[in-house]
Design a protein with these regions (language model features):
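N-terminal signal peptide c-region/cleavage motif recognized by signal peptidases
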Residues: 25-26
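Short, charged low-complexity linear motifs
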Residues: 2, 20-21
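Bacterial N-terminal signal peptides that target proteins for export
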Residues: 3-16
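Contiguous interface-forming segments/domains that mediate binding rather than catalysis
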Residues: 16, 20, 29-204
Length: 204
């Protein structure tokens, strides 16, 4: 019969506890993340941040818990000991994770020139992927360094070159997507400036 010494037993117990703690921490990280939702201003989100130049679209602060989006309430905010920059930093990491899962489709004209990129997904955070710090760089080779983005619905993003007016040619499509969606976001066109959204106006 083999016996384990008291010291070896203590070390084994300590190793198991460290492993369980690490596993629990990882589980919590994956299950509870911060997110910034690009949302229409008519939604009654209590904790929101403005988007420069926009009166119809906001960034709503939310948690993603076990895959479920839970907008932050004022009551919940009282128990969250984090500043907005701290929440934003984690939310941008969430946006990056979402963007990595996206597969943009490039739409070309009859001469095979890229007109715009379309991102569509069932992920409810699809529109928020534009906040990923690496978003603009991912399209620089195809659409140039200056981008325009439209997010007519929670599940759709259209990316254009700022040097073209392709977004105007698609205005009717963008508006129709917004009006017919169960989860509309915005009928505005935005620029991405240093990772921040700025509204250029509403498509008519």
């Amino acid at each position: 019969m083999h016996f384990i010494s008291t010291r070896a037993h203590a070390e084994l117990k300590r190793a198991i506890l460290v492993f369980l703690f690490a596993a629990a921490s990882t589980s919590t990280l994956l299950a509870d993340q911060w997110a910034l939702l690009v949302e229409p201003s008519f939604m009654d989100h209590k904790m929101r941040r403005p988007i420069e130049g926009s009166q119809r679209t906001v960034l709503a602060i939310a948690r993603v818990v076990d895959g479920e989006i839970q907008p932050l309430t004022r009551e919940e905010k009282k128990s969250v000991h984090m500043t907005y920059p701290m929440i934003q930093e984690q939310a941008l990491q969430t946006a990056s994770e979402v963007f990595k899962r996206m597969k943009p489709t490039f739409v070309r004209d009859k001469n095979q020139v890229i007109q715009y990129a379309a991102i569509e997904s069932e992920d409810p955070l699809t529109a928020s992927c534009v906040l990923a710090p690496e978003f603009a760089a991912a399209f620089e080779e195809t659409l140039g360094p200056d981008l325009l983005v439209a997010m007519p619905t929670r599940n759709q993003v259209l990316v254009f070159s700022k040097q073209d007016n392709a977004h105007l040619r698609l205005a009717e499509k963008i508006i129709n997507s917004y009006l017919t969606s169960n989860y509309p976001v915005s009928r505005e066109i935005f620029t991405l400036e240093s990772g921040n959204l700025r509204s250029l106006g509403i498509l008519e």
